[in-house]
Every structure is written in C-alpha cells, then in structure tokens.
Design a protein with these regions (language model features):
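N-terminal subdomain of nucleotide-sugar transferases
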Residues: 1-58, 243-246
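An aromatic- and histidine-rich active-site surface loop
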Residues: 14, 80-96, 106-130, 134-137, ...
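Membrane-proximal helix-turn-helix segments that form the acceptor-binding/catalytic region
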Residues: 20, 116, 123-128, 153-173
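Carbohydrate-associated surface elements
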Residues: 37, 179, 197-200
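Acidic anion/phosphate-binding donor-loop and adjacent secondary structure
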Residues: 185-191, 195, 200-220, 235
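Conserved donor-binding/catalytic core segment of Leloir-type glycosyltransferases
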Residues: 216-234, 240-243, 254
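Nucleotide-activated donor-binding/catalytic signature segment of Leloir-type glycosyltransferases, i.e.
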Residues: 221, 248-254, 262-288
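Nucleotide-sugar-dependent
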Residues: 234, 280-289, 294-319, 324-329
C-alpha cells in the first residue's frame, strides 16, 4: 500500500511512530512522512539537523517531508498554541500544493495532543480519495480540560465539537486503551470503526559499554527510577512531596527526562538531596538505567481522561521485569 503518515513529531525525536514507519517499510509498503523540524522536547531545533538537514530526508528509505513550523520554544501556553497552529496551517498548505495528486491508499495520523493534526488528513483525503486513520494517544481535548489548561466554556464547547467532527469524518480510529475506545465510541455513537491498538515496549539498545558514568546507584539504597516526560499530567509535585517525606530512609529517586513542568517543580521549594535529576538522555542509555533500578515509577494526575490512559512507558517497564510503583488511578 501507499501510505502517508502525518505526525508533528518524528525521528530523530523519540516517538513510537518511528517504529511504525520502520515496520511498514520493512513490510514492503510505500511510505512517506509529513512532519516538522525536530525540536521536541527542548523547543530548539536539533543542532545535528541544522548542520546536515539532508541526512534527515529519508528514514529507512521512507521519504520525509519537513515543514518549518515554529518550534515549541519554552513550552508556554502561547508557545504551544503557536507551535500547533503553525504546524496545522503549514501541513494543510504543503499537502494541498505538493501531495494532492498522489494516490495514497491511507493517510495515517499519529494522534498526540492536540489531535487537530488529523484535520490535514481529512482535507487531503478529499483530493486523493484516500482512507483516513488516526492512532489516538491522548483524549484531546478532554485531557486539557482536566488539567485546567483551557477553562473558557465557549472554547471547551468549540473544541469538543471539533474533535467529535474529526472522529466522525475519520474512517478508522485506533485507540491506545480499551477505555479510550469506549470514550470515543460513545461520543460518535459508532463502535465499529474504533479499534484498540496498544502501545508496545520501546526497543532499547543494549549499551554494554555502560556510558552512564554519572549514575549514582548505591547498593545500600532502594533506587527508584522514573523515565520520560515531566509535564502537568505527571503530577510531579506529589512525587516530590513523597520523596521529601522519605528523606531519612535509604531511598534515592532517579529522574531521567525533562518537560515543560520541570522548572516549575524545581521552583516549588526544598527538594531532597536524594532526588537526582539527570535531564534528557539518549535512548541508548535507557537500558542501563532500567537495569540498575530496584523499582520503576509511573505517576499521573487523577481525572477521567487521564485515568483512561495507559502510559507508554508501562509496557517498557513491564519488559524490564522490575517492580513498578504507581501513583496513578
């Protein structure tokens, strides 16, 4: 099949859509990708990309179209609004100019927040005659309502109507959990076109050279490891409170990752010396962190949409065969 994948995030950024593209190409499909310039999560375009952009025009022989949408920058509400809007506008403009005469069988949207990226898929499909599919990884806009990112009642109604319209106009909806499927099916009164596609464990390299020279994992301690995004949904202020309460115990908390809430968390006040922040690390280092952990941590804020979410890291944690500590409903 000839497949166009539309995703705001793509290699060299670390998202599972990279593995989807690789799998489809190795399975013999003709795949193209429409994406932005890599800048997640720090909001700055990757230096390697800027110095040699031609190296990022193909991924496992899949052609990659790059849009110069505005980066996330500091990740404020305004920054993210401009970032999302910029990508949506430029993806519609580019696809109608360059891709509308292509005979795609499927236009597939990688549905991270906000799922408005699928608007491009729906519009383009009217010209190409393609079927459309979306993999929904966030129950947007429900999740931003629960996090109080959007409070205005008029905007809430408009975004809710927009999302329901997107679902109804999409041919196949893949939900990341059974509760996602139930939620979406009820909204559009159509169970048949909503299927479940769970996330899978990340493919982690075995870094036998042990490049993690700065890891301070002492055998006398219970070493708790968290990997991934530190955003509003992760409820990290609660994690910090618990860690501070355990300060007199032989427990260390190793936080690998970054996110828009990291600076806010650090500015909350006293943070135990037993909470160690490693920042953003290369994917090739993750296996060493997991192998040295005694316990792996998952944390999510409470809410109906959030409670329906299966964090992507859970499958990877399960594969590590290490106890998991969850602050999650």
């Amino acid at each position: 099949m000839k497949i166009l994948i539309i995703s705001q995030y793509f290699w060299p950024e670390n998202f599972r859509i990279n593995e989807v593209v690789k799998f489809l190409k190795l399975s013999g499909h003709d795949v193209e990708v429409l994406t932005g310039e890599p800048n997640y999560p720090k909001g700055e375009i990757f230096k390697n990309y800027l110095s040699e952009p031609d190296k990022y025009k193909e991924y496992f022989k899949a052609k990659v179209y790059r849009l110069n949408a505005r980066p996330r920058k500091k990740g404020s509400k305004l920054d993210l609004f401009i970032n999302y809007s910029s990508f949506l506008y430029k993806s519609i403009y580019f696809s109608l100019r360059k891709l509308r005469k292509k005979n795609y069988d499927i236009i597939f949207t990688f549905g991270t927040s906000p799922v408005t990226t699928s608007i491009t898929s729906i519009i383009l499909s009217k010209f190409t005659g393609s079927k459309t599919a979306i993999w929904v990884l966030d129950l947007w806009p429900d999740i931003v309502f629960e996090l109080n990112i959007i409070k205005n009642k008029f905007l809430k109604k408009q975004f809710t109507n927009l999302m329901e319209s997107i679902y109804k106009k999409t041919d196949l909806i893949l939900a990341q959990s059974l509760k996602f499927k139930q939620n979406i099916s009820e909204k559009i009164n159509n169970d048949a076109k909503v299927k479940v596609l769970y996330q899978w464990p990340e493919v982690l390299e075995d870094n036998s050279e042990d490049r993690n020279s700065d890891i301070n994992f002492e055998q006398k301690d219970l070493n708790i490891v968290f990997t991934g995004n530190i955003g509003t949904a992760q409820n990290f202020e609660h994690v910090i409170k618990v860690a501070n309460a355990c300060e007199n115990l032989n427990v260390k908390w190793h936080i690998i990752g970054t996110g828009r809430d990291l600076n806010n968390i650090i500015s909350l006040g006293r943070i135990s010396k037993k909470i160690l922040f490693y920042g953003l690390r290369d994917k090739s280092e993750m296996l060493n962190f997991l192998n040295k952990a005694d316990v792996l941590l998952i944390s999510l804020r409470e809410g109906n949409a959030i409670n329906s979410t299966i964090p992507g890291k859970l499958q990877t944690y399960l594969l590590a065969n290490i106890p998991i500590l969850g602050s999650i409903s």
